[in-house]
Amino acid sequence: MLYLHQFLKLSTSLFIALILVAPTAQAAKHVNVLLYHHVSADTPRSTSISPDEFAGHMAYLQEQGYQVIALGQALSLLQAGEEVPDKSVAITFDDAWRNIYTNGLPILEQYNYPFTVFVNTDPIDQNHRMAMTWDMLRDMKQRGGTLANHTTDHDYLVRKADYGSQWLADTLANIDKAQQRLEAETGATPKWLAYPYGEYNNTLKQALKERGYIAFGQHSGGIAHFSDWQALPRFPAAGMYSNLKTLKLKLASQPMPIDYNALPDPVIRLDQDHTNPPVLNVNMLTKEKKGVRDQLSCFILGSPQKPVWQDQQNWHISAEAPLPSERSRYNCTAPIWGQKNYYWMSHQWLVYEH
């Protein structure tokens, strides 16, 4: 009997030890968000992915062990400084096109993937033939979707004569009206905004922050606790960006650890003598090793451009020639020390003259 008692005691101790050393699910401190518009082979290629291509993306996420999680879950955890599952990805769509419902939703349901649709509400209210109906949106919400704000009319928000009090009041009224329509038709709606065309300025960002909104652009990169929560990036995954060979590198990347809140206003007003080309000054959150500094690379309008380091934490980059009118981006990557993956950051510019 004594031997049995000792055996049970030893077995219990071994069992507890095994639990303590057993591998646990890995966690991460960032999420990469994919951005889609149309799911169709018959719509403008620049903002479209065919149903077959979209199915290929979803299959790749599953095959490679990516954890597709609800955007709200990821945002809540990261804002609180907590971790998300390793290889976390969130799926978003802009514009509430009907082909998202007819072509995209069945594929998403095959994998039980949650997703978010940013809705511009006027086309829904006006029964636009290419937009979803309110019934479709309510159905999507019941089938794993989250609905969020994309303004009422999808108008340009910062291509205006000036950025005075009337402009800001009108812009916020537009956003508030869309929020009210979403809540009236579909119930509780998170205070998230996707900027039409990804365009914003720092005045609008600050106003949205004061009103409790989280906002998303269309520049690329991942989201972490240190991100600018009124200018969150997403990786475009349609059109020229739908190629899995390049998308897989972006999915494996991590947000570059910089002070995103200190980045300059993205609007370059030619009628107000703003500097063009603009200089992007960047402050890293940690001192970087020489190997990382030497391999930091930036691309501007498709051409490589070498940044200049002031010290171990600060660097700047500028185009060699004035940026053209419309949107441009400075995209930069750097190796993560001790890993095969890369840091990624992007800053969008809008060169505009009223």
List the model feature ranges, each with a label:
Residues 71, 117-119, 215-223:
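A short glycine-rich beta-strand->turn/loop micro-motif centered on a GG-aromatic cluster
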